[in-house]
C-alpha cells in the first residue's frame, strides 16, 4: 500500500524534473537563435549603405499640412503643374503646337517635359460648375471681364480655400449661418436662390414662409453662388433643385497649392466678403492683358516665383469631393 504511494510520488517528481530540464533546454536554444539573428541584423545594417528611395517620392495620400521635400533642393523635378486656361486663349494663339512650345519654355525654368499639363475650360461660368484641380501645383488663368467680376470673385474664393460641406434639405429644414466662415455654396447649370429670414417665432421677416414669391432673391440663373446671410438668424430657402445643388459649407483655410492669375483689369479682385478690410492674398495675382502669347511668356518667366508662394499639397478638388471635404 505504502509502496504504491511512494512510487507514484517518485514518478511525479521525476516528471517535474524532466519537464523542467526540457523547458530550460528549449529556452537556451531559443535564446541562442534570437541572439544570433539580432547579431546578424546589426552587422548587416552597419555594413549596408542602401538609399531609402521612398524619401524623395511626392506624397499622394491624404494630408492637411504643407509638404516640403527636405532632401531635394529642386522640388519641381518630382512635381506636377497644371495650367487652366479659357478656350479664347487657344483661339488667340492660333498654333496647334503651342502646348509643346510652352512646355519647352517651362523646361528652361526647371520643369521637365511631361510635368506640365494644360487644361482648357470654356468660360468662367462653365468652369464654376465642375472645377477639377489634381496637380501638385495648380494655376488658373482668368481673363478679366467687367460683367463677370462677381463670378470671378466667387470662383477664386472657392478655388483658393478649402471647404467642409454637407447637404442641405431646404424643403424640410430652416438653416442659419453661425459665423463669417459659414457659407451656402450652390452649383449647377442654373441656380436661383431666394431666402426668407425668420424671427424667434419662425415667422418671416418681411416675407411669408408659405409664399416663395415674397422671398428675397440673392441670385438668378447663376452657375456658382456663394450665399452670405446674417449670422445667427434662421432662414427659409427656395432653390431651383432641378438644375442646382446647395451645400452648407465651412471655410477651413487656404488651399495653398492653387493660384489664380487675373488677366487684365485695373485691380486684382477682392475675394473677401468682409467690407472692413482690403486683404491681398499672395496667390491672387494679375498680369497685364496683351496677347495670349505674351501672357504665357509672362507665366513662364515668373513660374518659380509664383510657386514659391504656394505649398505642394496632396488634396485635390473635384465637384464630388468638394461637397464634403476639399
Swiss-Prot record:
Additional notes on this entry: Some rotavirus strains are neuraminidase-sensitive and require sialic acid to attach to the cell surface. Some rotavirus strains are integrin-dependent. Some rotavirus strains depend on ganglioside for their entry into the host cell. Hsp70 also seems to be involved in the entry of some strains.
Family under the similarity heading: Belongs to the rotavirus VP7 family.
Name of this protein: Outer capsid glycoprotein VP7
Modifications made to the protein after synthesis: N-glycosylated.
Residues binding Ca(2+) 1: 95, 206, 214, 216
Q: What is the lineage of its organism?
A: Viruses, Riboviria, Orthornavirae, Duplornaviricota, Resentoviricetes
Coarse class of the protein's main subcellular location? virion
Keyword annotations for this protein? Calcium, Capsid protein, Disulfide bond, Glycoprotein, Host endoplasmic reticulum, Host-virus interaction, Metal-binding, Outer capsid protein, Signal, T=13 icosahedral capsid protein, Virion
Q: Which source organism?
A: Rotavirus A (isolate RVA/Cow/India/Hg18/2000/G15P[21]) (RV-A)
GO MF terms on file?
Answer: metal ion binding
